[in-house]
């Protein structure tokens, strides 16, 4: 037999397994008071704290989304500014190339005109020197020719006017012959 059966058979009317009614009632009243206090005071505090935390989290999420949107907008603005800066740099580079080409063309044009001017001046100087050489040679050739002719002929050709005419006519004949030979070739 079990201990409970032995205890029940002993004749006492109190069952140790079944609690006393007054104890049960007192525990139920205490539990109801505790439940009332928890529902009335503790649960609202937890609800308030939970609501504050939820609001803080949702506010943080909203702030994070707002910051993300601002960062995205700033990134787009940065990309746009970067594209504008690149376009401006390309434009400046192209302008510099065009300006360099224009400067180079101007310098080539100036060099060509300066070269033409120098060539023209050189040709004028050469023509002047040639003319001076021709005049100088005519007088020298004339005097040498008259001296030589005077020695050959045996008489003096000291008359300057006559000797100059003879020399000029001789040189003119030489030039005419050289021009006709040059045209014939």
Swiss-Prot record:
F(1)F(0) ATP synthase produces ATP from ADP in the presence of a proton or sodium gradient. F-type ATPases consist of two structural domains, F(1) containing the extramembraneous catalytic core and F(0) containing the membrane proton channel, linked together by a central stalk and a peripheral stalk. During catalysis, ATP synthesis in the catalytic domain of F(1) is coupled via a rotary mechanism of the central stalk subunits to proton translocation. Component of the F(0) channel, it forms part of the peripheral stalk, linking F(1) to F(0). Keywords: ATP synthesis, Cell membrane, CF(0), Hydrogen ion transport, Ion transport, Membrane, Transmembrane, Transmembrane helix, Transport. This is ATP synthase subunit b. F-type ATPases have 2 components, F(1) - the catalytic core - and F(0) - the membrane proton channel. F(1) has five subunits: alpha(3), beta(3), gamma(1), delta(1), epsilon(1). F(0) has three main subunits: a(1), b(2) and c(10-14). The alpha and beta chains form an alternating ring which encloses part of the gamma chain. F(1) is attached to F(0) by a central stalk formed by the gamma and epsilon chains, while a peripheral stalk is formed by the delta and b chains. Its main location: membrane. It comes from the Bacteria. The keyword ATP-binding does not apply. It is a single-pass membrane protein. The keyword Membrane applies. One of its GO terms (molecular function) is proton-transporting ATP synthase activity, rotational mechanism. GO terms for cellular component: plasma membrane; proton-transporting ATP synthase complex. The chain crosses the membrane at residues 26-46. It is found in: Cell membrane. Belongs to the ATPase B chain family.
